[in-house]
A protein has these predicted regions:
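Aromatic- and glycine-enriched beta-alpha-beta binding-site module
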Residues: 97-211
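Interaction-surface and assembly-scaffold signal
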Residues: 3-46, 157-316
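N-terminal ordered "arm"
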Residues: 38-40, 45-98
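Generic detector of ordered, mature protein regions
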Residues: 73-79, 84, 88, 105-110, ...
Length: 316
């Protein structure tokens, strides 16, 4: 497979000084920027559905090993057990993603489109009551390449940090997530954010709480790394229903394979730093991950559906 996700090179801009086929394109495009203030109005009810559909997503998973004794404290009181990937070690991941969805209804001032960014802090676990039916002996590498065929091992979402209030509300009410509102500052390669060296394969993102204090930030550099396909979908997400006191699973179908990076160099490709926020997610990240080095990286990017090229003189 290709070594890394690639973005197309920037266009060869024409100076307009020749009689070639391309108009003079600006090297930069100026766009309007608004500072907005909002006043929350009363909540409104909307129909619920048994499935939620993403129109597009760019997702990154940073995988770490963690002692089972540490992970048990997070899941055993909720009727779940951390999966043993060998050597008394379980696994956790940081899943940062950018997503967009179509709501199918819009009005002036409401485009009917939703874009949101999230971080999930996940512990790999399963419902304790089905322990006899959970496959044993899987290594983390096997899991990341082939997944769990029984789909009983899943991501228990210790925290979900999201920058969209609607997504926060739906995550809590429909999917029973431990979800809360944050902000993000990020710059990642993509089809509309092409890069030249040396940062062509560098991903940066930071998560801040509602006071502006940083919870964590990460930098990922994929230069020189090669990936193998990972058959992870469908991914099982685990939550906890406080009313019935039972673990709850939901199935997230990514319609494609994951790019999975497993080389030893992965350990030096990520810089993870914690901020000064007093948010409990920061404290839990330090507790379960701390200064550990990642052992794997996974990525999934949904395919672009339309590519529109720049204009040219059509009368030549």
């Amino acid at each position: 497979m290709s070594s890394v996700h690639t973005s197309p090179p920037g266009p060869a801009f024409s100076s307009g000084a020749n009689a070639g086929p391309l108009p003079a394109f600006p090297k930069e495009t100026e766009i309007p920027v608004f500072k907005t203030t909002t006043k929350q109005l009363p909540d409104i009810p909307i129909p619920s559905a048994l499935s939620f559909y993403y129109a597009g997503i760019s997702s990154i998973w940073l995988w770490y090993r963690a002692p089972l004794d540490v992970l048990r404290a997070y899941v055993e009181p909720l009727g779940m057990t951390p999966y043993d990937f060998g050597g008394g070690q379980g696994a956790v991941n940081i899943n940062f993603f950018n997503a967009v969805c179509f709501y199918g209804s819009g009005q002036p001032g409401n485009q009917g489109l939703g874009g949101f960014n999230e971080t999930e802090i996940n512990v790999m676990a399963y419902a304790t009551k089905v322990a006899a039916n959970v496959p044993s002996g899987l290594t983390l590498e096997q899991y990341l390449i082939s997944g769990d065929p029984t789909k009983r091992i899943g991501n228990y979402r210790v925290w979900v940090a999201c920058d969209d209030p609607v997504a926060v509300a739906c995550g809590i009410q429909v999917f029973m997530e431990n979800k809360f509102l944050v902000g993000y500052d990020y710059d990642i390669p993509g089809a509309n954010n092409s890069r030249s060296g040396p940062d062509q394969f560098t991903y940066n993102w930071a998560c801040v709480d509602t006071t502006g204090a940083e919870i964590y930030k990460a930098q990922l550099k994929l230069d020189g790394l090669s990936c193998v396909p990972g058959n992870m979908s469908e991914v099982i997400d685990l939550s906890y229903d406080k009313t019935s006191r039972r673990p709850v699973g939901s199935r997230r179908n990514y319609l494609g394979l994951f790019d999975t990076y497993l080389q030893p160099a992965v350990s030096s490709s990520v810089q993870l730093k914690y901020g000064k926020s007093e948010n409990p997610m920061r404290h839990d990240m330090e507790n379960v991950i701390g200064t550990s080095k990642p052992v794997a990286i996974q990525m999934y990017k949904s395919p672009t559906c339309i590519a529109e090229a720049a204009g040219y003189y059509a009368d030549l």
